[in-house]
Design a protein with these regions (language model features):
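Non-heme Fe(II)/2-oxoglutarate
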Residues: 1-74, 176-225
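Catalytic core of non-heme Fe(II) oxygenases with the double-stranded beta-helix
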Residues: 68-178
Length: 225
Protein backbone atom coordinates (compact mmCIF):
# COMPACT_ATOMS: atom_id res chain seq x y z
CA UNK A 1 0.00 0.00 0.00
CA UNK A 2 1.17 3.54 -0.70
CA UNK A 3 -0.12 7.10 -0.47
CA UNK A 4 0.53 10.54 -1.92
CA UNK A 5 0.51 13.88 -0.10
CA UNK A 6 0.03 16.80 -2.49
CA UNK A 7 -1.37 20.33 -2.66
CA UNK A 8 -4.76 20.85 -4.33
CA UNK A 9 -5.82 24.38 -3.34
CA UNK A 10 -4.17 27.70 -2.51
CA UNK A 11 -5.41 30.15 0.11
CA UNK A 12 -7.79 31.99 -2.24
CA UNK A 13 -9.33 28.74 -3.44
CA UNK A 14 -9.85 27.61 0.15
CA UNK A 15 -11.73 30.84 0.89
CA UNK A 16 -13.98 30.33 -2.15
CA UNK A 17 -14.70 26.73 -1.17
CA UNK A 18 -15.60 27.69 2.39
CA UNK A 19 -17.78 30.54 1.15
CA UNK A 20 -19.64 28.15 -1.17
CA UNK A 21 -20.81 25.92 1.69
CA UNK A 22 -21.13 28.55 4.42
CA UNK A 23 -24.94 28.56 4.27
CA UNK A 24 -25.49 25.03 3.00
CA UNK A 25 -27.71 22.37 4.54
CA UNK A 26 -25.72 19.72 6.36
CA UNK A 27 -26.92 16.12 6.30
CA UNK A 28 -26.19 13.22 8.61
CA UNK A 29 -23.05 11.42 7.47
CA UNK A 30 -24.92 8.13 7.72
CA UNK A 31 -26.54 9.01 4.38
CA UNK A 32 -23.43 7.56 2.75
CA UNK A 33 -22.92 4.64 5.15
CA UNK A 34 -25.00 1.56 5.89
CA UNK A 35 -24.09 -0.19 9.16
CA UNK A 36 -24.09 -3.94 9.51
CA UNK A 37 -27.32 -5.52 10.82
CA UNK A 38 -27.45 -5.18 14.58
CA UNK A 39 -24.97 -2.30 14.65
CA UNK A 40 -25.77 1.29 15.58
CA UNK A 41 -24.66 3.62 12.79
CA UNK A 42 -23.66 6.51 15.04
CA UNK A 43 -21.36 4.20 17.00
CA UNK A 44 -19.31 3.95 13.82
CA UNK A 45 -19.78 7.27 12.05
CA UNK A 46 -20.69 10.60 13.59
CA UNK A 47 -20.21 13.49 11.19
CA UNK A 48 -22.01 15.73 8.70
CA UNK A 49 -21.76 16.02 4.92
CA UNK A 50 -22.98 18.17 2.05
CA UNK A 51 -22.66 18.44 -1.71
CA UNK A 52 -21.62 21.67 -3.38
CA UNK A 53 -24.05 22.98 -5.99
CA UNK A 54 -21.05 24.40 -7.84
CA UNK A 55 -18.09 22.06 -7.57
CA UNK A 56 -16.06 23.49 -10.46
CA UNK A 57 -13.43 24.88 -8.11
CA UNK A 58 -12.93 21.41 -6.63
CA UNK A 59 -12.40 19.83 -10.04
CA UNK A 60 -10.08 22.70 -10.96
CA UNK A 61 -7.84 21.79 -8.04
CA UNK A 62 -7.74 18.16 -9.13
CA UNK A 63 -7.07 18.96 -12.78
CA UNK A 64 -4.17 21.28 -11.90
CA UNK A 65 -2.52 18.82 -9.52
CA UNK A 66 0.03 17.07 -11.73
CA UNK A 67 1.27 14.86 -8.87
CA UNK A 68 -2.24 13.57 -8.19
CA UNK A 69 -2.95 12.89 -11.87
CA UNK A 70 0.34 11.03 -12.30
CA UNK A 71 -0.12 9.00 -9.12
CA UNK A 72 -3.67 7.84 -9.92
CA UNK A 73 -3.56 7.93 -13.74
CA UNK A 74 -7.04 9.31 -13.20
CA UNK A 75 -9.89 8.41 -15.50
CA UNK A 76 -12.90 9.79 -13.62
CA UNK A 77 -13.85 11.17 -10.21
CA UNK A 78 -17.07 10.90 -8.24
CA UNK A 79 -18.70 14.14 -7.13
CA UNK A 80 -16.77 15.39 -4.08
CA UNK A 81 -18.36 15.63 -0.65
CA UNK A 82 -17.68 18.24 2.00
CA UNK A 83 -17.54 16.58 5.39
CA UNK A 84 -17.66 18.24 8.78
CA UNK A 85 -16.63 16.41 11.92
CA UNK A 86 -17.67 18.52 14.94
CA UNK A 87 -16.46 18.19 18.51
CA UNK A 88 -17.21 14.63 19.60
CA UNK A 89 -17.42 13.43 15.99
CA UNK A 90 -15.44 10.59 14.42
CA UNK A 91 -15.45 7.85 11.79
CA UNK A 92 -14.32 4.54 13.26
CA UNK A 93 -12.28 1.91 11.41
CA UNK A 94 -13.67 1.06 7.97
CA UNK A 95 -12.95 0.36 4.34
CA UNK A 96 -14.44 2.50 1.59
CA UNK A 97 -16.81 0.48 -0.60
CA UNK A 98 -15.02 -1.28 -3.45
CA UNK A 99 -17.43 0.09 -6.08
CA UNK A 100 -16.65 3.76 -5.55
CA UNK A 101 -13.16 3.87 -7.05
CA UNK A 102 -9.52 2.86 -7.00
CA UNK A 103 -8.25 5.79 -4.92
CA UNK A 104 -9.66 7.77 -2.00
CA UNK A 105 -8.63 11.37 -1.30
CA UNK A 106 -9.10 13.63 1.72
CA UNK A 107 -8.23 17.33 1.41
CA UNK A 108 -8.03 19.26 4.67
CA UNK A 109 -9.73 22.69 4.78
CA UNK A 110 -9.16 24.02 8.32
CA UNK A 111 -5.99 25.22 10.03
CA UNK A 112 -4.74 22.34 12.15
CA UNK A 113 -4.45 24.55 15.23
CA UNK A 114 -8.21 25.34 15.17
CA UNK A 115 -9.22 21.82 16.18
CA UNK A 116 -7.83 18.98 18.28
CA UNK A 117 -8.01 15.37 17.15
CA UNK A 118 -9.53 14.59 13.77
CA UNK A 119 -6.45 12.92 12.29
CA UNK A 120 -6.89 10.71 9.26
CA UNK A 121 -5.41 7.37 10.31
CA UNK A 122 -4.31 4.82 7.70
CA UNK A 123 -3.16 1.25 8.21
CA UNK A 124 -0.06 1.14 6.00
CA UNK A 125 2.48 -1.70 5.97
CA UNK A 126 1.12 -3.14 9.23
CA UNK A 127 1.33 0.09 11.17
CA UNK A 128 -0.89 3.10 11.82
CA UNK A 129 0.04 6.37 10.11
CA UNK A 130 -1.68 9.59 11.26
CA UNK A 131 -2.16 12.68 9.10
CA UNK A 132 -3.32 16.19 9.87
CA UNK A 133 -2.38 18.43 6.96
CA UNK A 134 -2.39 22.15 6.27
CA UNK A 135 -5.41 23.64 4.44
CA UNK A 136 -5.44 22.79 0.75
CA UNK A 137 -3.21 19.75 1.16
CA UNK A 138 -4.62 16.29 0.61
CA UNK A 139 -3.71 12.66 0.96
CA UNK A 140 -4.57 10.11 -1.73
CA UNK A 141 -4.43 6.39 -0.99
CA UNK A 142 -5.69 3.10 -2.37
CA UNK A 143 -9.38 2.66 -1.65
CA UNK A 144 -8.74 -0.78 -0.14
CA UNK A 145 -6.78 0.77 2.73
CA UNK A 146 -8.23 0.36 6.24
CA UNK A 147 -8.64 3.82 7.79
CA UNK A 148 -10.50 5.99 10.29
CA UNK A 149 -10.92 9.60 11.44
CA UNK A 150 -9.99 10.00 15.09
CA UNK A 151 -12.42 11.75 17.42
CA UNK A 152 -12.40 15.54 17.29
CA UNK A 153 -11.78 16.69 20.86
CA UNK A 154 -12.39 20.40 20.23
CA UNK A 155 -13.26 22.62 17.28
CA UNK A 156 -14.43 21.16 13.99
CA UNK A 157 -12.73 19.47 11.07
CA UNK A 158 -13.85 20.26 7.51
CA UNK A 159 -12.55 18.29 4.55
CA UNK A 160 -13.19 17.49 0.91
CA UNK A 161 -13.43 13.78 0.16
CA UNK A 162 -13.69 12.13 -3.22
CA UNK A 163 -12.92 8.89 -5.04
CA UNK A 164 -11.09 8.36 -8.31
CA UNK A 165 -11.17 5.59 -10.88
CA UNK A 166 -7.88 4.90 -12.63
CA UNK A 167 -7.31 4.01 -16.25
CA UNK A 168 -5.14 1.17 -14.94
CA UNK A 169 -7.16 -1.53 -13.22
CA UNK A 170 -4.35 -3.86 -12.21
CA UNK A 171 -2.31 -2.36 -9.37
CA UNK A 172 0.87 -4.13 -10.55
CA UNK A 173 0.49 -2.46 -13.93
CA UNK A 174 -0.22 0.85 -12.21
CA UNK A 175 2.96 0.63 -10.13
CA UNK A 176 5.00 -0.24 -13.22
CA UNK A 177 3.51 2.57 -15.35
CA UNK A 178 4.10 5.01 -12.52
CA UNK A 179 7.73 3.88 -12.26
CA UNK A 180 8.39 4.37 -15.99
CA UNK A 181 6.73 7.81 -15.86
CA UNK A 182 9.03 8.75 -13.00
CA UNK A 183 12.09 7.56 -14.92
CA UNK A 184 11.03 9.46 -18.04
CA UNK A 185 10.59 12.60 -15.96
CA UNK A 186 14.07 12.15 -14.50
CA UNK A 187 15.66 12.25 -17.97
CA UNK A 188 13.36 14.93 -19.38
CA UNK A 189 15.89 17.76 -19.03
CA UNK A 190 18.50 15.76 -20.92
CA UNK A 191 16.21 15.38 -23.92
CA UNK A 192 16.17 17.85 -26.79
CA UNK A 193 12.96 19.67 -27.68
CA UNK A 194 13.17 18.69 -31.35
CA UNK A 195 14.57 15.59 -33.03
CA UNK A 196 14.91 15.08 -36.79
CA UNK A 197 16.58 11.67 -36.58
CA UNK A 198 14.26 8.79 -35.64
CA UNK A 199 17.08 6.55 -34.43
CA UNK A 200 18.43 9.24 -32.11
CA UNK A 201 14.94 10.00 -30.81
CA UNK A 202 14.09 6.34 -30.18
CA UNK A 203 17.35 5.74 -28.32
CA UNK A 204 17.13 8.61 -25.82
CA UNK A 205 16.21 7.38 -22.36
CA UNK A 206 13.15 9.56 -21.89
CA UNK A 207 11.60 8.14 -25.07
CA UNK A 208 12.36 4.58 -24.04
CA UNK A 209 10.89 4.98 -20.57
CA UNK A 210 7.87 6.88 -21.88
CA UNK A 211 7.10 4.12 -24.38
CA UNK A 212 7.23 1.48 -21.64
CA UNK A 213 4.62 3.47 -19.70
CA UNK A 214 2.46 4.08 -22.77
CA UNK A 215 2.54 0.39 -23.68
CA UNK A 216 0.93 -0.48 -20.35
CA UNK A 217 -1.67 2.29 -20.62
CA UNK A 218 -2.64 1.37 -24.19
CA UNK A 219 -3.53 -2.11 -23.01
CA UNK A 220 -6.39 -0.66 -20.98
CA UNK A 221 -7.62 1.49 -23.85
CA UNK A 222 -8.05 -1.71 -25.88
CA UNK A 223 -10.02 -3.31 -23.06
CA UNK A 224 -12.52 -0.43 -23.12
CA UNK A 225 -12.96 -0.36 -26.93
Amino acid sequence: MSYLISKFFDEDQIKKIKSSYKYCTWNDGLESYTPKPGCVGHDIKKNLQTNLTNSEILYEGMDQNAEFLAYTIARSTRDPLITRTPTGGYYRCHYDHWQIGDFSTTIFLNDSDTYAGGELCLWIDNKEERFKLDPGWGITYETGTCHMVSEVVSGERDAVVFWTKSWIRDMKDLYEARYWDMMAKRYEEQTKCVYTDLKEFSENLESQFREKSYRIKRKYLRIDD
